[in-house]
């Protein structure tokens, strides 16, 4: 399972090499990775989840708490990648806690309301879709993602 919260080329290149050498892998990454995936053969993958970012509610108490802790720790305001990274880490971590050591097979059943991403996967149509207010996009070329 790979979780990436940046589109920085310094991170993308080593992750691309890892993706090329693996047998099976879930990738949770920024949507901009999908836009460039024609350049990254490892990202032309059958098992990928690409979150999109709609908004961050800066009036929400959890968001304010995260922003204050981030500022106290790093001395700057969190970027959207900080929010994405937090949400993706929490989604994966809470899924592991809820479903146990073999959580990857149950990952699509996890529901998460994050600071910037909401993830609530539903089956239906030709491909699973996310039913969250803010959403994860599962593209039509990955319909068998949840048949694993």
Which positions does each model-derived feature cover?
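Extracytosolic ligand-binding ectodomains
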Residues: 1-148
């Amino acid at each position: 399972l790979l979780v990436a919260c940046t589109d920085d080329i310094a991170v993308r290149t080593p992750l691309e090499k890892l993706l090329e050498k693996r047998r099976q892998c879930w990738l949770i990454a920024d949507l901009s990775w999908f836009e460039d995936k024609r350049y990254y053969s490892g990202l032309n993958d059958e098992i990928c989840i690409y979150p999109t970012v709609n908004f961050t509610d800066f009036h929400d108490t959890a968001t304010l708490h995260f922003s204050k802790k981030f500022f106290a720790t790093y001395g700057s305001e969190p970027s959207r990648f900080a929010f994405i990274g937090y949400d993706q880490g929490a989604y994966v971590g809470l899924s592991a806690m809820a479903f146990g050591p073999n959580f990857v097979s149950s990952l699509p059943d996890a529901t998460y309301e994050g600071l910037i991403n909401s993830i609530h996967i539903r089956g239906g149509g030709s491909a699973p879709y996310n039913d969250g207010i803010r959403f994860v996009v599962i593209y039509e070329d990955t319909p068998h993602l949840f048949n694993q």
